[in-house]
From Swiss-Prot:
Record-given protein name: Osteopetrosis-associated transmembrane protein 1
Sites of Phosphoserine modification: 322, 325, 333
Species in which this protein is naturally found: Homo sapiens
Any single Pfam family the record assigns to this protein: OSTMP1
Single GO biological process annotation from the record: osteoclast differentiation
Lineage: Eukaryota, Metazoa, Chordata, Craniata, Vertebrata
Amino acid sequence: MEPGPTAAQRRCSLPPWLPLGLLLWSGLALGALPFGSSPHRVFHDLLSEQQLLEVEDLSLSLLQGGGLGPLSLPPDLPDLDPECRELLLDFANSSAELTGCLVRSARPVRLCQTCYPLFQQVVSKMDNISRAAGNTSESQSCARSLLMADRMQIVVILSEFFNTTWQEANCANCLTNNSEELSNSTVYFLNLFNHTLTCFEHNLQGNAHSLLQTKNYSEVCKNCREAYKTLSSLYSEMQKMNELENKAEPGTHLCIDVEDAMNITRKLWSRTFNCSVPCSDTVPVIAVSVFILFLPVVFYLSSFLHSEQKKRKLILPKRLKSSTSFANIQENSN
């Protein structure tokens, strides 16, 4: 119910003695002033009867949860101008929408493909606040009031949180250069991913409604093998392209949407369906391994067979020759 004009006029024109009356009345209520026969006696020398009644009514309204409203604030308290407050509300609404989108797209991860328009909107609102000059002096401009006026800096914290989340998700890898739409490679990968999941669902045996309820997945492994191999090959190509484009930044990833989609597919294929894709390079790898293993044996065997076998010749020592010749001389002399 809206207050009448008389009450509104009385609130807008509060007498100057009212703060003093409230202070004394609160002191009496808290026991700071001595009690007499009645509270009127305490204020008899300070306030008239009518003024005292007004103080009592106002004190009761404050104790019951009422307040003085904006009139209780100092008249020189700085406040935002309408244009700056509108910028703050725009940023608040955009932040709320982006936060809801991020939470709803957490599992399965769809952050980049679902929330990129809202992220661009938040970035735009933050740029508007940073560039706002306000209608007052430079020291109290809109940007300074919203971004640097207090220790918490809530607007700055929210903006940094959104930017950090976007960078860690590497959503720029899923978008075009101007970040206005999904890239062609991302759209193609997501289409193959949806096609592979559709193949899984159509080839499940039985009437189960969930991927995790059936036990026989032979039809899934047989009929969806090509779809899975195509998706896996495309993912490997995207990884190689990303590594070539980011040579100066090792450890970069694809966007979180693509990585999570591939992880889901591999988990279903390997763990849930227990399928396996035979490697076409198995035979050449085994042949090369066996050849390298027996190469030393072949080398030493061929060396032994083709080397010249020389007979051993006994060579007598020189001392033995001299002693033999000396013995012959003695025999001849005798």
